[in-house]
Amino acid sequence: MKRKIIVACGGAVATSTMAAEEIKELCQSHNIPVELIQCRVNEIETYMDGVHLICTTARVDRSFGDIPLVHGMPFVSGVGIEALQNKILTILQG
């Protein structure tokens, strides 16, 4: 089953693209089929139907119901990337 993931940032361009590429490669290397949706943080609710994970590169001080939310800045900075990858895999494989 395809896992639907929202990747969001302030402008839906630079940092979300970096995070989306990292997530895509991570999932491909673990044979997890994904559908990635890039958007602005303020557009997340528009795309939430059937979503398994939300990854934001901007700070978000709220929750989205039962959908897990991870902070994707390690994909941009490189700091803490392995821990984030493990967290994402745990969520998607669980």
Swiss-Prot record:
Phosphocysteine PTM sites in chain numbering: 9
Gene Ontology BP terms: galactitol metabolic process; phosphoenolpyruvate-dependent sugar phosphotransferase system
Reactions the enzyme catalyzes: galactitol(out) + N(pros)-phospho-L-histidyl-[protein] = galactitol 1-phosphate(in) + L-histidyl-[protein]
SUPFAM superfamilies per record: PTS system IIB component-like
Domain PTS EIIB type-2 positions: 1-94
Pfam families reported for this sequence: PTS_IIB
Gene3D superfamilies membership: 3.40.50.2300
Main subcellular localisation: cytoplasm
Domain of life: Bacteria
GO molecular function, a single term: protein-N(PI)-phosphohistidine-sugar phosphotransferase activity
InterPro entries hit by this protein: PTS_EIIB-like_sf (IPR036095), PTS_EIIB_2 (IPR013011), PTS_EIIB_2/3 (IPR003501)
Function: The phosphoenolpyruvate-dependent sugar phosphotransferase system (PTS), a major carbohydrate active transport system, catalyzes the phosphorylation of incoming sugar substrates concomitant with their translocation across the cell membrane. The enzyme II complex composed of GatA, GatB and GatC is involved in galactitol transport.
Entry comment, domain topic: The EIIB domain is phosphorylated by phospho-EIIA on a cysteinyl or histidyl residue, depending on the transported sugar. Then, it transfers the phosphoryl group to the sugar substrate concomitantly with the sugar uptake processed by the EIIC domain.
Protein name, entry field: PTS system galactitol-specific EIIB component
Organism encoding this protein: Escherichia coli O6:H1 (strain CFT073 / ATCC 700928 / UPEC)
Gene: gatB
